A protein has these predicted regions:
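Conserved SAM/AdoMet-binding glycine-rich loop
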Residues: 5-9, 210-214, 347-454, 460-462
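Glycine-rich beta-alpha loop elements in corrinoid/cobalamin-binding modules
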Residues: 11-14, 18-54, 72, 127-131, ...
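Flexible glycine/acidic-rich beta-alpha junction loops that bind and position SAM and/or redox cofactors
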Residues: 37-49, 220-225, 374, 426, ...
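Conserved Radical SAM active-site core
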Residues: 43-45, 50, 59-181, 206, ...
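N-terminal [4Fe-4S]-dependent radical SAM core
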Residues: 152-156, 164, 271-313
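Structural recognition of alpha->loop->beta junctions
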Residues: 227-250, 408-416, 472-496
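Canonical Radical SAM [4Fe-4S] cluster-binding loop centered on the CxxxCxxC motif
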Residues: 307-344
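Short, electropositive alpha-helical surface patch
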Residues: 377-382, 387, 466-483
Length: 554
């Protein structure tokens, strides 16, 4: 018997396992817990895009097409033809569909177009639900008729047939019968995972009622802290808030007892006498006490990339060392509770992951990498003659010196991601970014001179931002792209995030009112607020305009 089965639910990146479950698994195993893993996300996609399922969907689509002969039939028929090409390709070589991301230029890849059409046709019988594949980013997003931030909608979705409901049930059942765990832990990280996660829990509870089901992860810690819907607990036994390693280990130990004491497990939320109750907080595990992520939990050859192109996630520190940006959820403990490890220990963990997995691309997923720690890692990569490419998120920082950046480049740094947000001094100050335009110019110059490409992130529609200020920022960004100082720029419309300084004190940022969907009780972000400056409609229009203008530069 396995103690615990850890599940990564749909929908997240199909090109690699997310890091949360491997981190949990490594810690639990170091404490003597027997652990099994199920990446339900990739197993779903393998079933959803299998020749057998696509043939079924094609048949359903052709029936539906006859009903739509007078409304868009030409477009649908074009997609059906594309699906038939995909079916031919997959039938000839079943593995080919799961290696489509190996192209170095996905936007020009016919295979990517086939995948996009294949997803579109596979989703057609489930309209209005669908999965949207963005070729330029590789992300697959889930669009549902149900609201992901609403407890009542979650409960409704469980009772309905969805894109995933029939396909995941046999996968879950097979895994549980094989591993025979007494506890299942589901890692809920992204909003697109919410509805499938609760369906997963419902399947487990209906077929294996004696199994203890617990959920944790970034979404749970951010959006379900004050859960008031007791009915949710008919499908789960508990939630774990914030860092889950020590609480989950404690929970497994309690569940082995004849009379478990859930009240003794820290960071836990469970139902007691019909009401959700919270146990006391627990200090997170010191980063130096965490072992290397256990990617051996999953078979890496099941993802839609091969080892040569898989960018495996690796986290160095926890939280953000700046933790003051006004738009960020800085009141959540896993953001504000920053902790960084011994640099040499982290390098040894990195070396272990590379040796055990055989990957040659690493994505350091820290909110903001610490320049000194990255310097040590880069030095050791060179010293040990490790041949990898790596990317990382950085803040604009005076510690990004010419010498450090040249070292990063020599060690294999392939790209640097920078959250810039704005190039207007007033807006930067309101954001409390702790950076100036001079620092931005200085950093971009030395990064460019080192030969490392830059991906920058920008925001449109920050509270009180005017159209002139937004255009001023964009014009500067446009010039940087034109002069090849920035490789890529990603624009997004501003949203008010829960637990951020702006959400907690909106009046300080010129916000007069914030409109939230009354059905959404799980602290959703909001793009609907009233403030001086441009309207929300104008912000959206400008964002689309800027994206289009930058796309024309390719």
């Amino acid at each position: 018997m396995t103690d615990i089965l850890l599940i990564q639910p749909p929908f997240s990146m199909p090109d690699k396992p997310y890091i949360s479950v491997p981190v949990l698994s490594a810690y639990l195993k170091s404490k003597g817990v027997s652990v099994a893993g199920l990446d339900l996300n990739i197993e779903f996609f393998r079933e959803f895009l299998s020749p057998e399922h696509l043939h079924v969907c094609l048949g359903k689509t052709e029936i539906r097409l006859k009903e739509l002969e007078n409304s868009g039939a030409d477009n649908v028929q074009y997609k059906i033809n594309a699906l038939k090409k995909l079916l031919t390709s997959v039938s000839d070589n079943k593995a080919s569909l799961f290696k489509l991301f190996s192209s170095s230029r996905p936007s020009n890849s016919h295979a990517f177009q086939l995948l996009k059409y294949g997803l579109s046709l596979a989703c057609f019988p489930y309209y209005p639900e669908y999965l949207d594949f963005t070729i330029t980013t590789g992300y697959i997003r889930y669009h549902s008729q149900f609201k992901k931030f609403s407890s009542s909608h979650i409960l409704k979705s469980i009772q309905c047939e969805t894109i995933y409901s029939r396909l995941i049930e046999p996968i879950i059942s097979r895994s549980i019968k094989k591993e025979n765990p007494f506890c299942v832990g589901i890692s809920l990280t992204f909003p697109d995972q919410v509805l499938p996660t609760f369906k997963c829990a419902q399947i487990i509870k209906s077929k294996f009622p004696d199994i203890f089901v617990v959920m944790g992860g970034a979404f749970v810690s951010t959006h379900m802290r004050e859960i008031g819907e007791a009915e949710i607990f008919q499908y789960i036994d508990a939630l774990i808030l914030d860092e889950g390693e020590a609480p989950l280990n404690h929970l497994v130990s309690e569940l082995k007892k004849s009379e478990p004491d859930l009240g003794s497990v820290p960071n836990l939320c469970y139902l007691d006498r019909g009401r959700p109750v919270h146990t006391g907080q627990h200090q997170p595990v010191i980063v130096n006490d965490l072992p290397a992520p256990d990617y051996g939990l999953f078979s890496l050859d099941r993802y839609i990339v091969n080892h040569e192109t898989m960018a495996l996630l690796f986290r160095i520190s926890r939280g953000c060392y700046w933790k003051r940006c006004s738009f960020c959820r800085t009141e959540i403990s896993f953001i504000k509770g920053h902790s960084s490890p011994d640099a040499e220990l982290i390098f040894q963990h990195l070396k272990t992951v590379i040796e055990e997995t055989g990957v040659s691309i690493i994505h350091f997923s820290d909110d903001a990498a610490i320049p000194e720690i990255m310097e040590h890692i880069a030095t050791q990569i060179i010293k040990n003659k490790i041949s990898i490419k790596w990317v990382a998120n950085f803040r604009f920082d005076n510690r990004l010196t010419t010498d450090r950046l040249r070292l990063y480049k020599e060690s294999g740094c392939h790209s640097i991601y920078l959250g810039l947000e704005s190039l207007n001094p007033r807006i930067l100050k309101l954001m409390n970014k702790g950076i100036t335009e001079d620092l931005v110019t200085k950093n971009i110059k030395v990064i460019k001179e080192s030969g490392i490409p830059i991906v920058a992130y920008m925001i449109v529609g920050f509270p009180t931002e005017t159209e002139d200020e937004a255009r001023e920022s964009f014009n500067k960004m446009y010039e940087m792209r034109k002069n090849n100082l920035i490789k890529k720029c990603v624009y997004n419309v501003f949203e008010v995030a829960s637990s951020s300084p702006i959400a907690l004190s909106p009046e300080k940022y010129g916000i007069k009112s914030i409109a939230y969907d009354q059905e959404c009780d799980l602290l959703p972000p909001s793009s609907k607020f009233e403030a001086d400056g441009m309207s929300r409609e104008k912000a959206t229009a400008l964002c689309n305009e800027f994206i289009h203008a930058l796309d024309q530069m390719k």
